[in-house]
């Protein structure tokens, strides 16, 4: 594959002029984290606009998530790498520098990021855990639609290097490039300005670093990734503001659909008003695998 971006004019299809098509990957992260999230994801896919989900292979409800995925073959399922705020696949004695006595990663993403970057002794452990999570995904026999990370940790240089080195062997073809345009987001939503500016800066820098490396490996990514700066506030109102602004190309929107704390995101995915805008604009909902 020579092309890398699924952005404007790259590999789009639809209508009489593929270069003018608007395609939207609608993804739910944290598939398998809980039964509540699993139910929301299945409902959003069957009744709403959700096209894909990212599986936490060590999540408390991962087995149920796999059953749901098998029962819904049009749901694109990717691997949601977890290296912070979650449980590891490998036993603690294999990765003692990464997990506590209960086999869980730290809940402090800043601390984790600094340790993974500045402690060379942890790099082999990070690599082993990443590969173990890929092996766990492969054991499900589900097609790998894409790869991303919990809290977008897949763009951390230490994790990203493993992805690049092993992409061919592991069957990775599409990776989330987490770049949510700040100026556009400030126009579309309100509040949490410190969070939005800081995350735009951090992930903007990581995306700029990662983009040419993805290109070198022929790995695909969307033109932009919406949802990062919303911090689990992907609401109906936000989508009704965002969708009219989408330009030709392929874009990703991600959320954390759930029946509990994030029910507003489930409701946004089920919204008839949102579907009406999608249809009125001719926006095609798709999976990463549809864009290759």
Task: Please provide the spans of the model-predicted regions.
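Terminal accessory/targeting
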Residues: 2-26, 31, 35-146, 157-292
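Active-site histidine-anchored catalytic micro-motif
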Residues: 148-151
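Residue-level signal for short amphipathic helical patches enriched in basic/charged
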Residues: 154
